Amino acid sequence: MIDYQEVLSRYRPTQEEENKLKIISDDIIRKINSICRSRGLRAEAVIVGSYAKGTNLRDGDLDIFIAFDRDYPEEIINTEGLHIGHAVIPNGREKYAEHPYVSGEIGGVKIDVVPCYKMSFGDKKISAVDRTLLHTEYVNGHLDEKGRDEVRLLKIFTKSIGVYGAEARTFGFSGYLCELLVIRFGSFENVIRYFSKAKGRVLIDLDERFRDPMVLIDPVDPDRNVASPVSLESLSRMKIASKMFLSSPDEGFFQIEHNGKNVQYHDRGTCIMIYSLPKPDLTDDVIYPQVYRFRSVLQKIMESHEIRVISSEIDVSDRIYVLIETPACAEERIRVHTGPPVDTDNAVDFVNSWKARDRSRGPYIVADRLYVDVFTGQRSIEDIVRQEIFNYSIGKNLDRFKKSMEIMKFNVGMKSLPVLDKFFGADVFRK
């Protein structure tokens, strides 16, 4: 049996931390409201997020929105939002989502100050962040203290297995989705039982408009699927982890701080190349789609030379790392060039075009199609990538780093890298 109270005692904020968060948030709200009055703005500060809903874990963040009257132009709330954010967060940094906002720390607590429009139930949203105000109201109206702790357990569980967070880094379960799941199913264990039995797409709400792997409609916005960020891989991880937990409950499923197992690098008899770029100072939701694109371009280059990609991995830490595993570190000396079917009009032209060209053999026929075996020059993968990467865009913020791309060939004795740890330490889930 799992002692859930013991788990909660490790991760639920202490009274001292709650007092600190209240002092900081009250002070920021007071300052924001004072600035709004002095500048004649019809706006007010609102605390949102997990702290406002009482589902926060230790060392959490504070999300404070500046809710403007709905008749303000977007340029005004963007400009004023940044001005106010910088005024209340010394040394805060500007970040960009749907609206620009200010992020920083006060007293060791990470704080985001975000502008939005006021919104009531039934109002049409002006920007996507506006509905966050209603999320707080909805959750607080549907969770009691026990329910809040059930949400905390679900958050701890999803963090432990590596599927917490809707950001592009994870494509997993947002905090709001965890809250809605507990509201829908009643408890942490009921949620786990549901996922342990789920097969195929998880359609908690039936809505043919959405084709995502998981669908749960936002109760404050019927046109939004809260579960849309959940990838098929994250959903699969949740399913198998739920099955394993129910079959053998273990406190390892509630261990957020993973010490990391001792990953042993070993020779797989393949070629493992690591492509590295400098990391721009961007939010995860901006940088990760470009990292995925970078990986996709590398795979496309391999495939264009008939080099089979066995596996891949990415990591974004001090730099951007993309690992690509192939059978060998160079293209095959002979490549099969596919020609047209013999009954097409250009079949004879294809045969004649190869009469005077260097080739290993052919043209020859297999079934109804012509082929030629050609010499490739057997270039190394590194040479191929360095030459052909410039034929593709890898993202508007990464393209400028192509010339400075570093390429490393894996060997067992090389220094430890997070991308190698992830690759060699791949498991059903982190535990």
UniProtKB/Swiss-Prot annotation:
<dbReference type="InterPro" id="IPR043519">
    <property type="entry name" value="NT_sf"/>
</dbReference>
<feature type="binding site">
    <location>
        <position position="53"/>
    </location>
    <ligand>
        <name>CTP</name>
    </ligand>
</feature>
<dbReference type="InterPro" id="IPR006116">
    <property type="entry name" value="NT_2-5OAS_ClassI-CCAase"/>
</dbReference>
<dbReference type="Pfam" id="PF21133">
    <property type="entry name" value="CAA_C"/>
</dbReference>
<keyword id="KW-0692">RNA repair</keyword>
<protein>
    <recommendedName>
        <fullName>CCA-adding enzyme</fullName>
        <ecNumber>2.7.7.72</ecNumber>
    </recommendedName>
</protein>
<dbReference type="InterPro" id="IPR048833">
    <property type="entry name" value="CAA_C"/>
</dbReference>
<comment type="function">
    <text>Catalyzes the addition and repair of the essential 3'-terminal CCA sequence in tRNAs without using a nucleic acid template. Adds these three nucleotides in the order of C, C, and A to the tRNA nucleotide-73, using CTP and ATP as substrates and producing inorganic pyrophosphate. tRNA 3'-terminal CCA addition is required both for tRNA processing and repair. Also involved in tRNA surveillance by mediating tandem CCA addition to generate a CCACCA at the 3' terminus of unstable tRNAs. While stable tRNAs receive only 3'-terminal CCA, unstable tRNAs are marked with CCACCA and rapidly degraded.</text>
</comment>
<feature type="binding site">
    <location>
        <position position="155"/>
    </location>
    <ligand>
        <name>CTP</name>
    </ligand>
</feature>
<dbReference type="InterPro" id="IPR015329">
    <property type="entry name" value="tRNA_NucTransf2"/>
</dbReference>
<feature type="binding site">
    <location>
        <position position="155"/>
    </location>
    <ligand>
        <name>ATP</name>
    </ligand>
</feature>
<keyword id="KW-0547">Nucleotide-binding</keyword>
<dbReference type="GO" id="GO:0000049">
    <property type="term" value="F:tRNA binding"/>
</dbReference>
<keyword id="KW-0808">Transferase</keyword>
<dbReference type="GO" id="GO:0000287">
    <property type="term" value="F:magnesium ion binding"/>
</dbReference>
<feature type="binding site">
    <location>
        <position position="135"/>
    </location>
    <ligand>
        <name>ATP</name>
    </ligand>
</feature>
<keyword id="KW-0548">Nucleotidyltransferase</keyword>
<feature type="binding site">
    <location>
        <position position="112"/>
    </location>
    <ligand>
        <name>Mg(2+)</name>
    </ligand>
</feature>
<dbReference type="InterPro" id="IPR002934">
    <property type="entry name" value="Polymerase_NTP_transf_dom"/>
</dbReference>
<dbReference type="InterPro" id="IPR008229">
    <property type="entry name" value="CCA-adding_arc"/>
</dbReference>
<feature type="binding site">
    <location>
        <position position="164"/>
    </location>
    <ligand>
        <name>ATP</name>
    </ligand>
</feature>
<feature type="binding site">
    <location>
        <position position="135"/>
    </location>
    <ligand>
        <name>CTP</name>
    </ligand>
</feature>
<feature type="binding site">
    <location>
        <position position="50"/>
    </location>
    <ligand>
        <name>ATP</name>
    </ligand>
</feature>
<keyword id="KW-0067">ATP-binding</keyword>
<comment type="similarity">
    <text>Belongs to the tRNA nucleotidyltransferase/poly(A) polymerase family. Archaeal CCA-adding enzyme subfamily.</text>
</comment>
<feature type="binding site">
    <location>
        <position position="63"/>
    </location>
    <ligand>
        <name>Mg(2+)</name>
    </ligand>
</feature>
<feature type="binding site">
    <location>
        <position position="164"/>
    </location>
    <ligand>
        <name>CTP</name>
    </ligand>
</feature>
<keyword id="KW-0460">Magnesium</keyword>
<feature type="binding site">
    <location>
        <position position="61"/>
    </location>
    <ligand>
        <name>Mg(2+)</name>
    </ligand>
</feature>
<keyword id="KW-0694">RNA-binding</keyword>
<dbReference type="GO" id="GO:0005524">
    <property type="term" value="F:ATP binding"/>
</dbReference>
<feature type="binding site">
    <location>
        <position position="50"/>
    </location>
    <ligand>
        <name>CTP</name>
    </ligand>
</feature>
<dbReference type="Pfam" id="PF01909">
    <property type="entry name" value="NTP_transf_2"/>
</dbReference>
<dbReference type="Pfam" id="PF09249">
    <property type="entry name" value="tRNA_NucTransf2"/>
</dbReference>
<keyword id="KW-0819">tRNA processing</keyword>
<feature type="binding site">
    <location>
        <position position="53"/>
    </location>
    <ligand>
        <name>ATP</name>
    </ligand>
</feature>
<keyword id="KW-0479">Metal-binding</keyword>
<dbReference type="InterPro" id="IPR011068">
    <property type="entry name" value="NuclTrfase_I-like_C"/>
</dbReference>
<dbReference type="GO" id="GO:0004810">
    <property type="term" value="F:CCA tRNA nucleotidyltransferase activity"/>
</dbReference>
<dbReference type="GO" id="GO:0001680">
    <property type="term" value="P:tRNA 3'-terminal CCA addition"/>
</dbReference>
<comment type="subunit">
    <text>Homodimer.</text>
</comment>
<dbReference type="GO" id="GO:0042245">
    <property type="term" value="P:RNA repair"/>
</dbReference>
